[in-house]
Amino acid sequence: MGSEMCIRDRDRKVVAGYTWLGYDQGKIAASPLIAAVPFGMEPWEYSAWWYNGGGREITESLYVKYEIHPIFCGMTGPETAGWFRERINSLDDVKGLKIRFAGLGGQIIERLGASVTMLPGGEIFQALEKGAIDATEFALPIVDQALGFSDVAKYNYYPGWHQPFTSSHLVINLDTWKSLTRSDKAIIEMGCTAAVTRNLAHAEAVQGEIIANFDQVGVSAERLPLNLLKELKKVATQVIEEEAQRDADFAAVLASQKKFLANYEYWKSLAYLPRNFDEL
């Protein structure tokens, strides 16, 4: 569990941690919606939902049951769709594919016939190198390359359909949080708000240079076939709705996000240039 260190340590040697809440899925079914939603919000949309659309309040209500206080404390944009040892040309290439995948995205691609496993970051390179897995998703290009994925998997696919945003949270033992002074709480919250901004800015700034130099390490940046993306989105809708039917908290978070996005769409559809503006 991503925030387990705060609720399992009876001696209170660990009272806080920094984590991706999607790792809590086994205990808190709604946590992936707080961490990364396939075909979901973009980073600024998530931030707006968290700060002004009820996201903070509903997340706190989920975690108070486990005596944890979560604070939004980091944000990056899309991950890559993954690193593959072979090209992905069609839906058939996904069937039987052995891939490391986390969160709701793993459930979705498994529906298309992939064999999904969840490995810690430190074990992925060796699994790819030895052929135990054929592909992996993990993070951003700069992170993935530092872990050596570009040495053993030469096809890096986009877009990051499974994780168009990645939020990170500071999780604090609830009793510890309550014991802090108002000023200390304000300092922590202010620091995390600054971290969200700087984290996103830095992540956006450094990925392009990594991709631009892919040819020097024999890596090809590729786009997933459009028909595969459409099928992934279709299955994503099914998986998310099924999870909402199974779990009331999941349904509540999903409803909150949908309500926010429905109102936000009035602004988004009018205020921003279309992504394909230059092609119109």
Residue ranges with predicted function:
Residues W49:
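Short beta-strand-centered segments that line the small-molecule binding cleft or hinge
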Residues S3-E4, R8-Y46, G54-L280:
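N-terminal secretory/targeting leader peptides
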